């Protein structure tokens, strides 16, 4: 609970308050900017938020199991930052997004990446 950067996990609830959760704003919130109350330091992933997952005792056995994906080139990172239209992206880059399960998140990767680069 202490590790949640926005206080979305509280002692008196057994659920996560989605309206305070960084993952909600990274993945579902349809606006170009994050709310002012979310500090830039709260962001830690291009999609989602792993702080609660990383410290959860139930995850100890599994937390080190992750998918190693290819790195994005400078050119590919520029595609993301400039929000290049999906229809204009090179096919190998689209396949890389699909392999990393990021294609469905492409529309807001630019916003999410920019806040990580601050």
Label every model-predicted segment.
Residues 76-86, 97-99:
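Alpha-helical adaptor scaffolds
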Residues 4, 39, 103-107:
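Glycine-rich, flexible loop segments associated with nucleotide phosphate handling
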Residues 89-97, 101-118:
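Long, compositionally biased charged/polar accessory segments in the mid-to-C-terminal portions
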Residues 29-32, 86-92:
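Short amphipathic alpha-helical segments, especially helix-boundary/capping motifs
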Residues 33-40:
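Short linker/helix segments within small regulatory modules
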Residues 1-30, 42-73:
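Iron-sulfur cluster-binding cysteine motifs and their immediate structural context
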């Amino acid at each position: 609970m202490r590790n949640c950067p926005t206080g979305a996990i509280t002692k008196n609830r057994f659920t996560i308050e989605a309206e305070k959760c960084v993952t909600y704003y990274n993945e579902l919130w349809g606006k170009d900017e994050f709310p002012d109350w979310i500090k830039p330091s709260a962001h830690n992933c291009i999609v989602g938020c792993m702080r609660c997952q990383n410290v959860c005792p139930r995850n100890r056995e599994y937390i080190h199991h992750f998918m190693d994906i290819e790195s994005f080139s400078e050119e590919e990172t520029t595609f993301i930052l400039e929000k290049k239209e999906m229809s204009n992206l090179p096919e190998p880059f689209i396949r890389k997004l699909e392999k990393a399960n990021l294609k469905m998140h492409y529309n807001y990767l630019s916003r999410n990446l920019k806040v990580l680069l601050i």
